[in-house]
């Protein structure tokens, strides 16, 4: 709660939109493998009504400084938020969440 309250205070009169601030922080936490904080900001993106394709694009930019494996893990965090019913996805991302066999190499063995 204190983290979100601090983030809210920082956003007062900020020169960037709340959506951009949320996805930027999500991408930064992805680079540092801070999965709980990533969840908070993905949920914040949904709360702000951000387009899911723009969210995916925002996270994809973090592949360069934060690595592809971190991006893949971040997508897993997002996928679990959808599957656990913690966010309400649009049709395309609901279909993504309902698609089986996305666990990496587990399905091969």
Pin down the residues of each PLM region:
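Residues at alpha-helix boundaries and short interhelical turns
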Residues: 14, 31-35, 49, 69
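Acidic, glycine/proline-rich low-complexity segments that act as flexible tails and inter-domain linkers
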Residues: 1-20, 46-47, 71-109
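Amphipathic, charged-and-aliphatic alpha-helical interface segments
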Residues: 20-35
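A cross-kingdom feature marking solvent-exposed beta-strand/loop segments within repeated
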Residues: 40-59
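Short acidic alpha-helix initiation/capping motifs at coil-to-helix transition points
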Residues: 1-4, 31-39, 66
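Short acidic/histidine-centered micro-motifs embedded in hydrophobic/aromatic stretches
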Residues: 27, 58-62, 74-77
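Substrate/cofactor-recognition hotspot
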Residues: 61, 66-69
């Amino acid at each position: 709660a204190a983290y979100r309250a601090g983030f809210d205070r920082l956003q007062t009169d900020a020169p960037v939109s709340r959506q951009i601030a949320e996805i930027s922080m999500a991408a930064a936490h992805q680079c540092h493998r801070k999965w709980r904080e990533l969840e908070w900001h993905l949920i914040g993106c949904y709360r702000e009504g951000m387009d899911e394709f723009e969210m995916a694009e925002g996270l994809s930019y973090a592949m360069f400084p934060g690595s592809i494996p971190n991006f893949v893990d971040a997508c897993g965090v997002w996928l679990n938020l959808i599957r656990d019913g913690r966010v309400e996805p649009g049709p395309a991302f609901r279909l993504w969440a309902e698609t089986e066999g996305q666990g990496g190499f587990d399905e091969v063995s």
